């Protein structure tokens, strides 16, 4: 997550402090973003103007492959974490864009529940780690480990590049090869994700989360039941669970949702089918419930 932010803080060809902001303000983009997932980081751009699209592609490729992070440690400190002293009498605190962003995320019980679910279901794979960053552990990341991660994984050999739309595909591929891909030798990157081995029995986990002072514990419990189901490559199974998700939980008058509410299990029922991990998850979550 810190790398996702940091590579967009200037590069060899575009040594601006924040080229991403300049593109947001000055380009004709129809989509411009970057997203971190447990198993990948995505840098998507889109534009209806061919020249603009070409420029966006150039800026993003240079950002990902030739970022200024090797020249300026302050990028890591700004986007990741650093010590800060607001005054000589103030306590020394942590600060940083991603650090503060994730502190905000971890103030949400839904975010905490999602993180705990992933850790419990996938303790031995990357899905059990919070790719956004747990604010408790973010300050343990050193600048050297940060750079090592980029050197290891931010390489064309460990990437997929997708081009889609009405364009001269040969021209775009030739540009990518001439200006970027041909400058790298093949690298054997070990980024294969192994499947989590099944547990011998259902795992029961009970954890606490903070509530506001003006809230009590009554009707503030979350009850979550989660199952790993098959493999994401099984499209027929995925379709079946999408239908089950809609029929049981999402459709108007969905029977499972209504039955749980009628039984007083929770005042709201969430959940569904998540096909984004290698091993998909089907979840049923009762919100505003009680321990009993």
What are these model-derived regions, one by one?
Residues 6-200, 206, 214-234, 240, ...:
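Charge-rich, well-structured scaffold segments of protease-associated domains
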């Amino acid at each position: 997550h810190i790398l996702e932010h940091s590579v967009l803080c200037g590069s060899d060809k575009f040594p601006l402090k924040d080229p991403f902001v300049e593109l947001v303000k000055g380009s004709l983009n129809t989509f411009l973003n970057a997203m971190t997932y447990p198993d990948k980081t995505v840098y998507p751009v889109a534009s209806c103007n061919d020249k603009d699209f070409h420029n966006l592609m150039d800026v993003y490729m240079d950002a990902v492959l030739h970022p200024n992070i090797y020249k300026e440690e302050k990028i890591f400190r700004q986007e990741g974490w650093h010590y800060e002293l607001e005054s000589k009498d103030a306590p020394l605190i942590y600060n940083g864009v991603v650090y503060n962003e994730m502190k905000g995320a971890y103030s949400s019980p839904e975010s905490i529940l999602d993180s705990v679910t992933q850790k419990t279901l996938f303790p031995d794979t990357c899905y059990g780690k919070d790719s956004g960053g747990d604010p408790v552990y973010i300050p343990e990341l050193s600048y050297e480990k940060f750079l090592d991660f980029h050197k290891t994984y931010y390489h064309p050999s460990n990437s997929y590049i997708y081009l889609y739309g009405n364009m001269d595909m040969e021209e775009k591929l030739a540009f990518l090869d001439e200006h970027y891909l041909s400058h790298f030798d093949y690298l054997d990157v070990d980024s294969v994700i192994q499947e989590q081995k099944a547990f011998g029995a259902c795992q029961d986990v009970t954890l606490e989360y903070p509530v506001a002072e003006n809230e009590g514990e009554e009707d503030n419990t979350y009850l979550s039941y989660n199952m790993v189901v098959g493999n994401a490559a099984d499209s027929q199974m995925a379709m079946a669970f999408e239908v089950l998700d809609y029929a049981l939980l999402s459709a108007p008058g969905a029977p499972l949702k209504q039955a749980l509410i009628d039984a007083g299990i929770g005042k709201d029922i969430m959940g569904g089918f998540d096909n984004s991990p290698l091993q998909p998850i089907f979840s049923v979550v009762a919100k505003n419930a009680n321990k009993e």
